[in-house]
């Protein structure tokens, strides 16, 4: 086989739908828009959520809740992600960011207790779940809670 003999896989290349180019094409005359009406006109159609004039669903349902602008957003990781560090390493949110364990530190890092920890580490400047504290201390590490 040579480069000039290469063919695309059967069915992978589809011809574009050329509408309004004569009746012989099968998409002439009304160009797939049917007969008259709002949708046949240029710029026709209704806006999203419009239900023909009846009260739309988004207005029938009550508003609920609010966004607390003071809420703290924490990036959460599990203790098994800390196994990449050497024994005795001091871990802070900055170190986690530097080693790409987390992609960003929002209002802080919270360490959760899923998985197993084999390394003895000193973890500072984070929030912890109870199970994470137990697992870090069981592995011989230290926890400094903020």
Swiss-Prot record:
The keyword Lipid metabolism does not apply. It comes from the Bacteria. Pfam families: Ribosomal_L27A. InterPro entries: Ribosomal_uL15, Ribosomal_uL15/eL18, Ribosomal_uL15/eL18_sf, Ribosomal_uL15_bac-type, Ribosomal_uL15_CS. Keywords: Ribonucleoprotein, Ribosomal protein, RNA-binding, rRNA-binding. Disulfide bonds: none annotated. One of its GO terms (biological process) is translation. Part of the 50S ribosomal subunit. Binds to the 23S rRNA. Belongs to the universal ribosomal protein uL15 family. This is Large ribosomal subunit protein uL15. The lineage of its organism: Bacteria, Bacillati, Bacillota, Clostridia, Eubacteriales.
